[in-house]
């Protein structure tokens, strides 16, 4: 399967690890300080969570403004905070490789769409909509 028709796969640094994301799942990119109690475009409080913490990385971002990816759900919006967001250097579109059943069965949460090969190494492709949904319903 090809990632997006226009190849909009980005790389995020969340804690110590890099992941691939689909730009199509993001409503807005920006800088957010969660202490400021940000609101979404509908005037509701924006739910802010550190993506690295959700993915099991113990490294915590320092207080202050962080790169944020806002995912809009039906009733709420979730801002996933990361260390850095960047374009992938190279040619797209990228082919999404499914995760093997062995790996998929061992995942605690089904937050990965597959993997792409970038600079001869795999990058896990995150399902940001699924992550945001789990955050919004309080599952994590």
Where in this protein do the model-derived segments appear?
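An acidic, low-aromatic, low-complexity terminal/linker signal
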Residues: 1-140
